[in-house]
Amino acid sequence: MEETETKRKFLEIVKEFGLQHKSVNSYEYTLPNAKPTDFLIFYNEDKDIIYCAKKLRSDYKDYINNYCDWTFGFTGIVYYKTNRARQRVIKILKQYKQHLNKIKKLEMEKDFA
């Protein structure tokens, strides 16, 4: 399959945020240090869309059942056909990366205490 603009943008985001491949057989990525069930960003080659999902609940079944079209409630799917959707994906990634950095910093401080 040829490389589309959407796929190129997706791969740029993967590189920019240092996302890690979650599944060998698909375009599923997650942030380093994140639990794979906490945050995922996907590229769907058949539909040529990018979407991401972030979990609210600890129950994985709830996570799957609570996808929605894009209510910014931190479960949801972003369809990556517009620049606004791209900006939201990047905003979520930045927020989540900050969250992970805070956790890492707290753990380091705890280790030194």
Label for each model-derived stretch:
Residues 16-20, 92-99:
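Surface-exposed polar/charged interaction patches
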Residues 13, 92, 108:
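Residues that form generic nucleotide/phosphate-binding pockets
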Residues 7-10, 85-89, 99-102:
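Short amphipathic alpha-helical segments that mediate assembly, nucleic-acid/protein binding
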Residues 1-33:
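Negatively charged, low-complexity tracts enriched in Asp/Glu with abundant Ser/Thr
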Residues 3-4, 83, 95:
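Generic detection of long, well-ordered alpha-helical segments
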Residues 35-87:
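Intrinsically disordered, low-complexity regulatory segments enriched in Ser/Thr/Pro
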Residues 95-113:
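Short acidic, low-complexity intrinsically disordered linear motifs used
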